A protein has these predicted regions:
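Core catalytic lobe of class I
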Residues: 1-259
Length: 260
């Protein structure tokens, strides 16, 4: 994003299907209102740690609020009335983020708190191991788009509705809010890149398929390794991607170039 764009609202086609190295707040301010169909962001988790690729926010409430309140307000402004937002976050500050979302989007537009569960990592001495991320799901209005995603159900389970009818003759059931069937990013996978906290494509694919249609516009303002943009391109969605780290944008562009 060059200096000429700052302070001027951009028509969406000029920024769609591109990723840019920019402060996400400044980029969002240049996007016209009510233009985005879906926002997914794997936001900063507030650990206070310094990673190889970025420095996380400290878990201090004032710092968290000063960073996220203006950004979430902009996300609300640029989201369509039929749109929805998913913010992925760790358990350390998820309660603060939910309060901000309640204030900006309205608690009545809270749809779900999804738990993405995974294995691996260490075991703390004086606490339960933390083995899930929180994904907060909100809509802008009650007129949002949503399509159930299906998964194979256990042979031990009933796979039935409350009235006893089977969900699907092919042995599938709608995905619920407890996601245990998607593994973390495999470091040996061909999709793996040299970037911290890379999320698996299957995770983002589920969200994009559930809350957008082909040719819709999806935005990720904490792009990281670029997985959201890659999945959008593969699923025929338009996208906007942004990250303040030049390395992230370099990796994302390389991955996008590799998508046929």
């Amino acid at each position: 994003m060059n200096r000429e764009t700052i302070g001027r609202k951009l028509a969406v086609p000029r920024v769609a299907n591109s990723v840019c190295c920019s402060d996400n707040l400044e980029l969002m301010k240049t996007i016209e209102s009510n233009k985005i169909d879906l926002i997914y962001c794997d936001i900063l988790y507030g650990t206070g740690k310094k990673f190889k690729d970025y420095h996380d926010l400290k878990p201090i409430r004032n710092e968290i609020e000063s960073h996220y309140i203006p950004r979430i307000k902009e996300m609300h402004r640029i989201l369509k009335d039929t749109g929805s937002i998913y913010l992925q976050i760790g358990t350390k500050i998820s309660h603060w983020i939910r309060l901000i979302l309640d204030d900006v989007f309205g608690y009545y537009n809270f749809l779900n708190e999804i738990s993405w569960c995974y294995a691996g990592g260490g075991i703390p001495k004086n606490n339960y191991p933390k083995k899930h991320d929180v994904i907060l799901f909100y809509s802008k209005t009650k007129e949002y788009y949503f399509k159930h995603q299906m998964r194979s159900y256990s042979q031990k389970g009933s796979g039935r509705r409350s009235n006893g009818d089977k969900y699907d003759l092919q042995g599938q059931t709608p995905v619920n809010d407890w996601w245990i069937d998607i593994s973390p990013q495999n470091t040996q996978s061909k999709d793996n890149v040299d970037y911290n906290t890379q999320k698996p494509k299957a995770l983002i694919e589920r969200i994009i398929k559930a809350s957008s249609n082909e040719c819709d516009l999806v935005a990720d303002f904490y792009l990281g390794s670029g997985t959201t943009a890659v999945v959008c391109k593969e699923l025929n969605r338009n996208f906007i991607g942004c990250d303040i780290n030049p390395k992230a944008i370099e990796i994302a562009n390389a991955r996008l170039d590799a998508v046929s």
